[in-house]
Regions:
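Polar, glycine-rich mid-to-C-terminal structural blocks
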Residues: 1-22
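Long, ordered, helix-rich scaffold segments
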Residues: 2-3, 7, 39-185, 191, ...
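A broadly tuned preference for mixed-charge, low-complexity surface segments
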Residues: 19-26, 138-139
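A surface-exposed beta-strand-loop module
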Residues: 22, 28-48
């Protein structure tokens, strides 16, 4: 996808250029060697790769995506799993940084704005919105740490989840729908406790 969320036509080198309206925006690449190289041509915008779309096997892909790349995927990717995964990776980076004391336990505006775009998307399923807006759980966070402090992990996660709740309260009814009509739609706002950031700052790392 492009950085403004537009799908980019995919034409491999040595392929004829497709006629207007016959472009291909997704394709399967066969990896049958230890190393495979593919060159795309006539790429009309800076791309952000959305890989393994629709893939069902449990594969962990090592890809050098930056925070800016992940924010693009979170806001615009049409593949549900890739969109969710981008949000989880962004949240994980922020949570782990705060737990390790490398950053304040405060979510940045870019992340909150990207989450807001998910919440306000008119075509996304409400249950999927709740899933995307949920931060990685405490067990996953603990697995990423060399030294585990359960109290700090819990406190940092609660603070950041509370910040998401506060930031998006105004858009919940429009984005998630009438919670009285569908209990699934309560999953995001009803379980979020707003915790003060200073509750974390006093904890030892």
């Amino acid at each position: 996808v492009s950085r403004d969320g537009r799908p980019i036509a995919l034409q491999l080198e040595d392929e004829p250029r497709p006629m207007p309206g016959r472009e291909v925006f997704e394709r399967v690449l066969v990896l049958d060697e230890a190393k495979n190289f593919f060159t795309f041509v006539n790429v009309d915008a800076e791309p952000v790769p959305s890989l393994l779309r629709g893939f069902s096997a449990p594969v962990i892909l090592a890809e050098p995506l930056s925070d800016d790349d992940l924010l693009v995927l979170l806001k615009h990717d049409s593949d549900a799993f890739n969109r969710w995964e981008a949000g989880q990776r962004l949240a994980l980076n922020r949570l782990l940084g705060a737990i390790r004391g490398e950053r304040e336990p405060v979510l940045d505006d870019a992340f909150i704005d990207a989450m807001r775009s998910v919440l306000r998307h008119p075509q996304l399923d409400p249950a999927f919105k709740c899933l995307v807006l949920s931060l990685p759980d405490e067990n996953l966070l603990a697995e990423q740490l060399d030294s585990v402090n359960p109290q700090r992990i819990h406190a940092v996660r609660e603070v950041m989840q509370g910040q998401l709740a506060q930031a998006h309260t105004a858009g919940v009814e429009d984005g998630v729908g009438d919670r009285r009509r569908d209990g699934r739609r309560r999953a995001f706002t009803d379980r979020l406790d707003v915790v003060r950031p200073d509750a974390v700052l006093g904890l030892e790392q």
